[in-house]
Amino acid sequence: MATKILELTDVNVIRAAGGVVYRTDSSGDTELAIIHRPAYDDWTLPKGKVEPDESPEDCALREVREETGLRCVIERPLGCTAYVDRRGRDKVACYWLMEAKGGRFRAGIEVDKLVWLSVEDAIKRLTYPRDKKLLEQQDF
């Protein structure tokens, strides 16, 4: 069986974008924001579908704001992950490192919890291996 390479520009691929959101705590350590989605009972990184005529970067900022309430600034791209979603659709999610600059989390139907964790603890808490791998490949 041939391996299918997913391209972000492929019209049959669902494009998503999100953020690895960080802040520096009072002791100078990096903490990452991860979210809990009750519909899936998972811990993941904030992300969502790229709308038509929306850049992936704008989508990432919008989705992070919608899901976390945080205002962020993009620092750099972190890479993309390709996978098949729960409905059997091909999906490519691209992520950017973002610094939280303000805002406040409010629990909702889509996202009911946000936690700030050390990089090591965030990797342990995340549900999906693809999210864990993305963080493990970074130098925070």
Question: Residue locations for each model-derived region?
Answer:
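Acidic, metal-coordinating catalytic segment for phosphate/diphosphate chemistry
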Residues: 1-26
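Unchanged
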Residues: 50-137
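Short, solvent-exposed loop/turn segments that connect beta-strands within catalytic domains
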Residues: 24-31, 87-88
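A short gly/proline-enriched turn/hairpin at secondary-structure junctions
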Residues: 44-47
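A short, flexible beta-alpha/helix-coil linker loop
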Residues: 40-42
